[in-house]
């Protein structure tokens, strides 16, 4: 039997999603340990998209296979009670055997939030980035539109990125402000390592007036990571979750 889970987590205390076997706790290892305890047998999960250390997940989707019979609600609640307080299973549904959390997804969504004021955050320091320079979100939004479409995003990929190529389709990019908080929301078919944080780091330079709006288009065309902006800090980034065709019968928040 194959199940899909929707998982929410605060990434502050983890070295990332992936279980690499050493170097500190991972979200994946914590989830697999809890699931295995419920099943009373070892279980492994496959996720829709891996996140880095300090990055959060609002509705990460995973799947796992098991012969153990449990009600979906028992998987959800039983697993959550065995997890650290920074991880929760939001839902569990049985899925077809050919459903794949990663390969069945048609899009992925991220949100980056930063506090734009002179003084650093105290209360929300684990879920907000911070920029003391005054930023113009309208300039950031205008600049970001140059990235929409299928492009080579080499200028915004990490040097550690292991993807075979840098072509990705960015479907939308919206920059907005609510009071002192600027939000960058993106959706694409897939993302390169550090791609969202590198885009945000470059957009900040446009918003501060250090670079013109046209600079983002020039970066994209130049494909040179060394001349783009710095990588934005991880704590402002949330993986909102993937999106799937409706034939998989998943909850509405992850369905196209």
From Swiss-Prot:
A Pfam family that the UniProt record links to this protein: PseudoU_synth_1
Keywords: Isomerase, tRNA processing
InterPro entries per UniProt: PsdUridine_synth_cat_dom_sf, PsdUridine_synth_TruA, PsdUridine_synth_TruA_a/b_dom, PsdUridine_synth_TruA_C, TruA/RsuA/RluB/E/F_N
Residues binding substrate, per UniProt: 110
Bridged cysteine pairs (disulfide): none
Family annotation (Gene3D superfamilies): Pseudouridine synthase I, catalytic domain, C-terminal subdomain (3.30.70.660), Pseudouridine synthase I, catalytic domain, N-terminal subdomain (3.30.70.580)
Family recorded in the similarity comment: Belongs to the tRNA pseudouridine synthase TruA family.
Protein name, as recorded: tRNA pseudouridine synthase A
Name of the gene this protein is made from: truA
Task of the protein: Formation of pseudouridine at positions 38, 39 and 40 in the anticodon stem and loop of transfer RNAs.
GO MF terms held by the record: RNA binding; tRNA pseudouridine(38-40) synthase activity
Top-level lineage group: Bacteria
EC number: 5.4.99.12
